[in-house]
Amino acid sequence: MKRKVLAMLVPALLVAGAANAAEVYNKDGNKLDLYGKVVGLHYFSDDSGSDGDMSYARIGFKGETQIADQFTGYGQWEFNIGANGPESDKGNTATRLAFAGLGFGQNGTFDYGRNYGVVYDVEAWTDMLPEFGGDTYAGADNFMNGRANGVATYRNNGFFG
């Protein structure tokens, strides 16, 4: 019985992506976090465009600074590195997120840059699966539905009550 469990556990651990985060700096209201994720992924498909190695790694930084009692500045940068192509293929690396913003305490946040559009906030409730999640209408570089460039967003968690 132990061998069967071990035989199932080892492949599951090899397939699962690892996500980690580390606090680089946190002092006097200033905070900087480093995070990352490595995913080994292989698709088996009759479609030659989606068959094969889809492995990738992501690295990012999140920062925040306390400007005043109810006033903060923040930013985030996240980069995707495709591990499934040659170095000459520049199409599999891209900046996923790059934005800066201001937080106004209980009154919400305002940011600008490459970020998720506000429609994604609603769609994110279905984007929970590790693969094929949130595929209803979200996509990268699709205005307000997914990640896009030049997006100004206002978010407030307590707006409707």
Swiss-Prot record:
Q: Which residues form a coiled coil?
A: none
**Primary site of residence:** membrane
Compartments, record wording: Cell outer membrane
Membrane topology designation:
Multi-pass membrane protein
Which GO cellular component terms are attached?
Answer: cell outer membrane; pore complex
List membrane-spanning regions: none
Single GO MF annotation = porin activity
- Which SUPFAM superfamilies does the UniProt entry name for this protein? Porins (SSF56935)
Any S-S bridges, and between which cysteines? none
Q: Which CDD domains match?
A: gram_neg_porins
Q: Where is the signal peptide?
A: 1-21
Keyword terms = Cell outer membrane, Ion transport, Membrane, Porin, Signal, Transmembrane, Transmembrane beta strand, Transport
**GO BP term, pick one:** monoatomic ion transmembrane transport
**Family the UniProt entry places it in:** Belongs to the Gram-negative porin family.
Record's protein name: Putative outer membrane protein YedS
The beginning of the lineage is:
Bacteria, Pseudomonadati, Pseudomonadota, Gammaproteobacteria, Enterobacterales
